[in-house]
Amino acid sequence: MRFFLPLTFLLLAAPWPLPACAESINGHDYVSLAGWARANGFGGYAVKGEVFVLTNKTARLLFNKDSADSVINGVNVRLSFPVAKGGFISQLDADKTLRPLLFAPKPAAKRISTICLDPGHGGKDTGYRVGRFFPRSEKTYTLALALELRQQLNQAGFNVMLTRDKDIYPELPVRPDLANRCGADLFVSLHFNAFSTGDPASVQGPETYCITPVGAASSNDAEGAGATHAVCAANRVEDKSLRLAYQMQRALVRSLGATDRSVRRARFEVLRSAQMPAILIEGGYMSHPVEGKKIFDAGYRKQMAAAMVRGILAYQKLTAPPPSKTNPASTNKVSSAKKPK
């Protein structure tokens, strides 16, 4: 099987974003988008209606007035706080969203070898169920996707472990703990969505979640609600998790032609204690009359798994360590890691 690496978003040459003057808005530090743009190599700054546009030779950023919605190089990304009044972005978003996605990361100490896949739900926990007479359970399709993804990741040269490989329910804290104890390099939790109120045809598309930064509310919380300064293990690698989430969402949307429901933040229990880059993917809406049928189709899940492999390969390319002088052509060993007992 051939995998085509999409071009990763072009990173700015500066090693670190420069500060802009901050002011307090609604109890949070904010910086002017225009000032941030000047300080960080964005020669283009324009206001088009209620949209602020920042551009340079390699990047294009869109921010909506009074909204947490942004578009970073063609991918929808939810900010931690809305853009305020005359074009101000929170300092936290400048540091924890723009910096990780636009400025080159330090090379990783080693290549990605082992990936832990977590098929959501299982056993007593069916997850979402759709269909009146012949209900379909989310747990069935997360496992089917995980098994397909494991096969494709093996073919791409990665070791893969699963938190479950049958219809059982590992408790939520157990899932990232398995990844931690096995020294996994990435943790990917697989889920599907459903829309229970209103028109089920009105919502579709994948969402990719990573851990919420300290001091911010999660993407699905009411404005300002849920903000906390508590630190969890996953916050130690939150920049890496955001980069992984971005590359995964980018690959899913582009490969599947799906609606972009954006990169989001959440303090899900399966993410909080992960000691490696960790994301949770909502692969689409089972409740949507068209997308749901695709999710139930093995051929479409195969395409989705291939897109996820592309996302992981793009992240690996972005963070790859320098080539070894003794073995510059080293690659991942192809094997399948068994779940620890």
Residue map of PLM features:
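Generic marker of residues within folded, mature protein domains
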Residues: L5, G44, R60, P105-P107, ...
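Bacterial N-terminal signal peptides
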Residues: L5-P15
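Active-site-proximal helix/loop segments of hydrolytic enzymes
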Residues: R136-K341
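Short stretches within intrinsically disordered, low-complexity N-terminal or propeptide regions
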Residues: P15-W16, T331
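Primary recognition of N-terminal secretory signal peptides and signal-anchoring hydrophobic helices
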Residues: W16-D125, V130-F134, Q152, A156, ...
